[in-house]
Amino acid sequence: MITKAEIRGFKRFAHERFAIAPLTVLAGLNGSGKTSLLQSVMIAAEASKTRSVAISLNGPFGLELGTAEDVLNWETRSPIEIAFEATTGTATWQLTVPSEEALYLEIAERPVDLPKAFSGTPRAFTYLSAERLGPRGFSAASPLPEAELEVGVKGEFCAHVLSVLGDRLIESVDRSHPLYAPAPPRLLKYEVEQWLSEIARPIEITGERASGATVAELRFRAPGSAWVRSTNMGFGITYALPIILAGLIAEKGGLLVVENPEAHLHPAGQSRMGVFLAWL
C-alpha cells in the first residue's frame, strides 16, 4: 500500500510531501493543488506502464495538461520528480523537459521495484474522472480481455463489465457486503445492487451485450417492476455505478482514485457513498 507521496517541480508544487492513508480525502479551496496531486499520480501510472522514453501530457487517463511549460513549477526549473513510498519501498520517477513547447516529458529515471498500484496488475490502478458518463442507451464494449476488464476513466465500460462479470462470484470474500459477511461470496451484480440500493433506492441491474456486438447496454428496474433503459434513470445512479463496480473488482492493495464521488447524489446517498469508500 502507498503511504506517502513526494512531488518536486510539478505545477504548483516546488516540493511537497503528502501522507496517504487507506482512505485519503482531498479537500480545500479551488486552486489549492488537489487536481495537481491527482495528475501526478496519473503521470506515474502512465510512466510505469509505457515502454517509451517519454510520456504524453495529453491523452492518458483523459489528461489535458498542455505543453511542458504548463506543468513546470514557476519557482524552480529543476526536473520534475514524483515519488511514492509504499510498504515495498520507494518508487521515484524523474521527468525532464526537452523544450517548453513539447507535448511530452522525457523519462530520465524510473524505479525498478513498483508499488502494486503501478505494477501493471489488472485493476490495481483505477482512475474515475469527475466527468463520468450519464445515462446512455448504449456504450462501447471494452477491447480488453476478460481478466483485464475495467470500467474506464468515465465509467464507459460498466455495461460490458457487468455483462461479462455480473453473474460471477466476487473474487474476494472481503468484498462481500457487511450485511452478508462472513457468508460465502455472492454474485458481483448482487453486491453492486446492494450498494446502489443503499445509495439511491432499491434497484436491480443487468448488463447485456449481444454476441459479436461492439456495444453493450445497461438496464435497471425496481424490484418487481419492468426493466428500463439507463436513459430512463437519474444521473445519480449512473454516476454512482462506476464507483461501486470499480471498487468491487479492484485488486486488493491497489489504488482507486475517484473525483467527485458525491456528484448528482442526494445528501443521504453521499453519506452512504462515503461509507462504501471507507469500507473498501
Regions found by a protein language model. Give the residues of each.
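Walker B catalytic motif
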Residues: 258-261
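The start of beta-strands in P-loop NTPase/AAA+ ATPase cores
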Residues: 3, 124, 254-255
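Conserved hydrophobic alpha-helix in the ABC-type ATPase nucleotide-binding domain
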Residues: 273-274
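Pre-Walker A-like glycine/lysine-rich segment at the N-terminus of P-loop NTPase domains
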Residues: 1-47
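Phosphate-binding P-loop
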Residues: 15-21, 247-252, 279
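Short, solvent-exposed loop/turn segments at secondary-structure junctions
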Residues: 10-12, 25, 32, 132-135, ...
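Phosphate-coordinating catalytic segments in nucleotide- and nucleic-acid-processing enzymes
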Residues: 47-242, 246, 251
